[in-house]
Amino acid sequence: PTDDPTHGKQQLALFHGYYEQHQYFPLMISEPTTKHMFLGWLRPGTVHAALGAEDDVLRVVLPLRVEQPDMAIHLRGDCGFGLPKMYQVCEDHQLTYTFGLATNNRLKAQTTDLVTQAAQRYEETGEKQRLFTHFEYQADSWDRPRRVIAKAEHQDAGTNLRFVVTNLPVTSDEQAEQRYDDYVQRGESEQRFDELKNGLELGRLSCHRFLANFWRLLLHVAAYNLLNAFRDAEETPAELRHAQPAKWRSKLFKVAAKIVTSTRRVLLELPTHWPHWPLFEAMCQRVLAFIPYTTPRPAIP
């Protein structure tokens, strides 16, 4: 989830004590390879971080299973999503997962030796230490034991102890480290949220009605995915390839223009000496390449 501050009297924009602001609390699901947003779901400002998450996962997964039944799907999420009902959904639908797990006294007791060993190695070498282990663990709310990976990191600031729960196979401490390092790559999804919020103004959910703002959120997600598709295409000009959304806006869209309409066409008139015209022309040609025409394609004057 990501917090989305509000500054008016929108429906269901409520005060969240942790963030200390009035907000919406949208849930986003992204895919790391294509960097696309698979789902954006607007929620009231005070809901639990995982509210409805298992249903949203199924909204994404079930259509994929119909199209590609044998596709391997792996979910990553922080400890806010690490709930028994989420584990059950993943296991029922043959999904692998790695979720953060909140630290508690039982977990600390099982990793006392690991923490001590990390501290001793740091004292001996003066270098940061990262040690890993794995074990079976069952919380009181779980129906059965599950595999937990523990990381003990020791440096000048002290010991940093973290846990994740996974249903991936783990047969050694080295493999536990690999699984954990893969889990922390979920932080890359935060970059997607930043691009949406800062580059495409996701926070502009300023309609009064909740459903209207929900629609605006979906438009933001669709715009992001469209931009993302062009941004990573080989035919896209090098200056824009992999560029931030803010650069796309400043180079292609922030320009004075005149729109002339007639019964036969809509004409967009741009300044004669616009410095970014070559980029705009190249992207127009790229867009036209997507359009199936039965008649000759229109020329760009």
What are these regions (language model features)?
Residues 1-28:
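Active-site-proximal, Lys/Arg-enriched surface segment
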Residues 16-25, 58, 92-107:
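Acidic, His- and aromatic-enriched active-site or binding-groove loops in soluble protein domains
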